[in-house]
Amino acid sequence: MEIIRVDNTKDRDAWLLFEKTYNEIENKEFFAFDKEYTPPKDGFTYKIYDNNKLIACFLLTFPHLDEENLGYDIGLCEKDLLKVAHMDSVAVDSSYRGRGYQNILMKKAEEDVVKLGYKYLMCTIHPDNIYSMKNALKLGYKNVLTKEKYGGKIRAIMFKEVASFN
């Protein structure tokens, strides 16, 4: 098993795994997926390969002062909005689910976020997505707000404060 990190703007194969995951899941409400590939402006994609096959990927994005910054939803001031990192999306190949890859990728991304000086980690999860919710809670995220996001999809906004090196 190999984990690599690449710049989000250069990674189309991860998007293909996201598309495959979306097409396979039963409850489409669990997964906010944009069918048009638009790479995030700033961030990284973490990927796990098994024998050269992409089996899991995770998007970490830095929203800065973009209107999509989840910090706006919880009332963070502008200075703190600049310290928000989005633990954005995860996709795991169906034949590899249940092996802890979401947790592994989130931990790796968190290590990098701390080194880069970010202080607030945020993500959204459908409240009924038990597996993703358990993973986030296990990593210390708190459900700070539940509201409609992404064109009317209900989401729990998850928040975690970390100590940064900067």
Q: Where on the chain are the PLM-derived regions?
A:
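A short beta-loop-alpha structural element at the N-terminal edge
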Residues: M1-L16
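Active-site rim helix/loop that mediates acceptor-substrate recognition in acyltransferases
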Residues: N23-N51, L59
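Conserved acyl-donor/pantetheine-binding loop and adjacent beta-alpha core of acyl/acetyltransferases
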Residues: C57-S89
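A short, internal acetyl-CoA/4′-phosphopantetheine-binding micro-motif in the GNAT/acyltransferase core
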Residues: L76-C77, D88-R97, I125-H126
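Conserved acetyl-CoA-binding loop-helix of GNAT-fold acetyltransferases
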Residues: V92, G98-E111, K134, K138
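Conserved beta-strand-loop-alpha-helix junction that forms the acyl-donor binding cleft
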Residues: R97, C123-M133, G151
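Conserved GNAT acetyl-CoA-binding A-motif
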Residues: V113-I125
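Conserved active-site alpha-helix within GNAT-family acetyltransferase domains
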Residues: K115, P127-L145
